[in-house]
């Protein structure tokens, strides 16, 4: 696989594989169930979904429990994560690819990206926004670190690996057919169902 940015190679390599061990387990699944029940409370009729940057499928596990029978697809850049993802959804529906190399051949009721845009180089974000929009049949859920203006911060000792900004606002500016339906915040110190200080935005394509 050939990469266009340093960030893609970073997540496809050993760091991305190590990430798997830090992000799994029943506690995370419970938090994800709570998260998606809240974030998707305004959504109706979700029968299919695609997740951009799904890792081993912890988000999709929760969505499958909340929406039994959902037709779930995913894109994942890391080979080991993509292999494990094939235990959660049918392997044929796992796209082992960089998001920048993915061209949606169809649309899904729900398009999801959670904790991924923050790790993509800002110069290629417009390309990612366009792919998210193209894949979106009705709902787009963006769940990321939020900052009103773009900022880069160190990530586990690495520079240029974590970027905060108003991702959802930029997507809606670029694609006015998307309208904000709901939004909220998930706090890392929540006593019951913590998440990693994620601000989420549910948009609907109209």
Label each residue range with its predicted role.
Residues 118-120:
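A short His-aromatic
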Residues 112:
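A conserved beta-strand element that flanks and buttresses the S-adenosyl-L-methionine
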């Amino acid at each position: 696989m050939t990469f266009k940015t340093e960030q893609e190679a970073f997540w496809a390599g050993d760091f991305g594989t190590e990430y798997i061990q830090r992000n799994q387990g029943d506690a995370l699944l419970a938090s994800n169930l709570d998260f998606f029940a809240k974030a998707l409370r305004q959504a109706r009729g979700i029968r299919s979904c695609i997740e951009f940057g799904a890792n081993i499928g912890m988000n999709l596990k929760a969505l499958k429990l909340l929406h039994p029978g959902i037709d779930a697809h995913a894109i994942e850049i890391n080979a080991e994560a993509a292999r494990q993802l094939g235990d959660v959804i049918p392997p044929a529906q796992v796209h082992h690819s960089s998001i920048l190399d993915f061209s949606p051949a169809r649309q899904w009721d729900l398009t999801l990206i959670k904790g991924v845009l923050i790790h993509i180089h800002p110069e290629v974000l417009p390309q990612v926004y366009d792919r998210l929009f193209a894949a979106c049949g009705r709902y787009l859920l963006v769940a990321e670190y939020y900052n009103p203006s773009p900022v880069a911060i160190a990530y586990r000792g690495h520079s240029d690996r974590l970027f905060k900004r108003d991702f959802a606002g930029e997507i809606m500016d670029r694609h006015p057919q998307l309208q904000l339906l709901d939004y909220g915040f998930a706090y890392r110190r929540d006593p019951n169902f913590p998440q990693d200080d994620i601000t989420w935005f549910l948009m609907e394509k109209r």
